[in-house]
UniProtKB/Swiss-Prot annotation:
The gene is mutL. The keyword DNA repair applies. Residues 338-407 are annotated as: Disordered. One of its GO terms (cellular component) is mismatch repair complex. SUPFAM superfamilies: ATPase domain of HSP90 chaperone/DNA topoisomerase II/histidine kinase, DNA mismatch repair protein MutL, Ribosomal protein S5 domain 2-like. It comes from the Bacteria. Keywords: DNA damage, DNA repair. This is DNA mismatch repair protein MutL.
């Protein structure tokens, strides 16, 4: 008897589902793509229990006949391909004919559909691959697909799913991607019978982006200069450096209305920005139209990655579009800086358009918004003022933002304040004693020589010369002292008027999951509605305008780490790292403190760099110095 056998159709579909149906968001992706391919103008998505309990996608598209409805659940059945040549000129989102049978094999599946010209519709039911007899149904024109009890017959797959909160955040992110790709389509999303959003169709991409982002992001949008290359055109919006993230959560890239994640495109984006800080990723909304014959979308199971036939043309066009846009925007800011700043007035307290006042937008100063390589040199060394109101409004009005905040009034005193700044007389006495001890300790091997430009401390060692940056050293010292007393609460400042922020659903899920750990780290954060949080206190020394950026950086660090085990440590160390940096760099350090600081630094667990990775000590060996003078080492 042969050991090789042909899998049953049901088993084959369940195996294929491993690639097609990774999580509830994968189901939503496939179903919404089918709706869009059917020409829908309104797509409604409903989920329960993160999508595991139920997913329902309803559209007003073309619908299907009974024959097509029965065939669409068969493997490799599709209306979008009839020859190999068509594969290389595909314009549809889906084309393999694997999604519906794979989904139906691991769930309780129901499809109701009706064509506009038909008097009645049809209902198809499949339970874990077991098909029921089709029956007529009185439904509206279009298609409605309901997927219940996802992975009920493959419990091993269900174990790999995250919490309902996390899975729901991925579902919402997937819907947002399609809503950004198709602003001309109305999208509605309900979660556990609660309406999350209902986005009306619009011809203005900025309106759709503004509806799905917070006010700070919407106000900072920079239109990309439409750029046309060989077989490709680029448009969209850029965001300044202040909106950069440690992950690519802020990057939305679409190719022929298809959300894509491609390393080639990522490199082109970085090259376009030029001089971008290591470890950060620029935020943008990039829309590419590429001739179908010049791109292969059949290279990834989920069709997230693509392969370009003329990749150099794609890279050059993206780089040109981004670089030209940044340069033009920088010139506009420099020009606006020459004009007098218009007088600004605050809206009255009873205003109906902004009842609580808007959170101030981030600075768009060209000195802070973009890398130096992406903007022309200023005419003088004077700081450039922010972009004027008239320049900001040159691209059309932005609809009322969803991000609101009550004006901040900080409590003057901080809670749990730690005093790292010693009185000068105490420092003098202690340093004199420690300096003498350091000089008597021959094993220390460091002889203090003095300072360089009142900024660096110089020490002679048996191996050569050591330069220490006292403030960077103090940053490391303060960080490790705070880390050693982790049980103590982080110094914080209470906000009389809490700040309310709207967030990306994935960021909101992380914050909601680990909010208790934030308290010890000095930031009290509580959920405040769908994808909205309220900040009630922030770490001492943290300015309010940096609270959002600081919170998102913490989310990125939690996402990058194994936060299921280390969330408390990551949250605490992120906050104390920021506290140590601000505390150290605000200190006034006199030169005679250098030896004592060095001694404290060398007692640290990691003395050679700050928590952020910047060096605290730089060593020049004697052989290296001799080589500089042309002497034999």
């Amino acid at each position: 008897m042969p050991s090789i056998h042909v899998m049953s159709p049901t088993l084959a579909s369940q195996v294929a589902a491993g690639e097609v149906v990774e999580r509830p968001a994968s189901v939503v992706k496939e179903l919404v793509e089918n709706s869009l391919d059917a020409g829908a103008k309104f797509v409604r998505v409903e989920i329960r229990r993160g999508g595991v309990g139920m997913i329902k996608v309803t559209d007003d598209g073309s619908g299907m006949s009974r024959a097509d409805a029965e065939l669409c659940t068969k493997r490799h059945a599709t209306s979008k391909l009839s020859s190999l040549e068509e594969l290389f000129e595909i314009t549809h989102l889906g084309f393999r004919g694997e999604a519906l049978p794979s989904i139906a094999s691991v769930s309780r599946f129901k499809l109701c559909t009706r064509q506009q010209q038909d008097l009645e519709g049809w209902e198809i039911r499949i339970d874990g691959g077991l098909e029921h007899e089709p029956r007529s149904s009185g439904v509206s024109p279009g298609t409605a697909i309901e997927v219940a009890d996802l992975f009920y017959n493959t419990p091993a797959r269900r174990k790999f799913l995250k919490s309902a909160e996390t899975e729901a955040s991925h579902v919402e992110h997937q819907i947002r991607l399609h809503a950004l790709a198709y602003p001309q389509v109305r999208f509605a999303y309900k979660r556990d019978d609660q309406l999350v959003f209902d986005l009306p169709a619009t011809a203005d991409l900025r309106v759709r982006i503004s509806a799905l982002t917070d006010a700070a992001t919407a106000a900072a949008l920079i239109p990309i200069e439409t750029t046309i290359g060989p077989g490709i055109s680029i448009t969209g919006f850029l965001l300044p450096l202040s909106e950069a993230r440690r992950t690519r959560k802020g990057q939305y890239v679409f190719m022929n209305t298809r959300p894509v994640e491609d390393q080639l495109i990522n490199r082109a984006i970085r090259d376009g920005y030029g001089g971008f800080p290591t470890g950060l990723h620029p935020a943008l909304f990039l829309y590419m139209e590429v001739e179908p014959a010049l791109v292969d979308v059949n290279v990834h199971p989920a069709k997230k990655e693509v392969r370009f036939r003329r990749s150099a043309d794609v890279v050059n066009t993206i780089v040109e579009a981004i670089a030209n846009t940044l340069q033009k925007h920088a010139r506009q800011e420099i020009h606006a800086a020459a004009a007098p700043e218009p007088e600004r007035t605050l809206p009255p307290a009873h205003s109906t358009t902004a009842p609580y006042g808007e959170i101030p937008a981030r600075s768009t100063n060209p000195g802070s918004a973009f890398p130096a390589a992406a903007r022309p040199a200023p005419a003088s060394s004077a700081a450039q003022p922010p972009l004027s109101s008239s320049a900001k409004q040159s691209h059309g009005a932005v609809p009322p933002p969803t991000l609101r905040a009550i004006p901040l009034k900080q409590v003057p005193a901080t809670q749990g304040k730690l005093d790292f700044h010693r009185q000068e007389d105490e420092e003098t006495a202690r340093n004199a004693h420690e300096n003498a001890a350091l000089e008597r300790d021959a094993s220390a091997g460091f002889s203090y020589l003095g300072t360089l430009r009142q900024q660096f401390a110089l020490f002679e060692t048996p191996e050569g010369l050591v330069l220490m940056h006292p403030k960077a050293a103090r940053e490391r010292i303060i960080f490790e002292r705070l880390r050693a007393r982790r049980e103590a609460p982080m110094p914080s400042q209470q906000l009389l008027d809490p700040v309310v922020l709207d967030l990306d659903p994935r960021d909101f899920a992380v914050i909601r999951q680990f909010a208790p750990h934030f308290d010890q780290a000095g930031m009290a954060v509580t959920p405040f509605g769908q994808n909205t949080i309220r900040i009630e206190s922030i770490p001492a020394l943290l300015e309010l305008e940096n609270a959002r950026a600081f919170l998102l950086e913490l989310v990125d660090r939690l996402t990058q780490s194994e936060f299921s085990r280390n969330a408390k440590r990551v949250a605490y160390e992120t906050f104390i790292g920021e506290f140590a940096r601000k505390s150290a760099w605000r200190e006034r350090i006199s030169p005679h403190r250098a030896p004592a600081i060095l001694k404290d630094l060398l007692a640290c667990e990691v003395p050679y760099c700050t928590p952020g990775g910047k060096p605290t000590l730089v060593n020049y060996s004697v052989p290296e110095i001799k080589r500089k003078f042309g002497l034999q080492a």
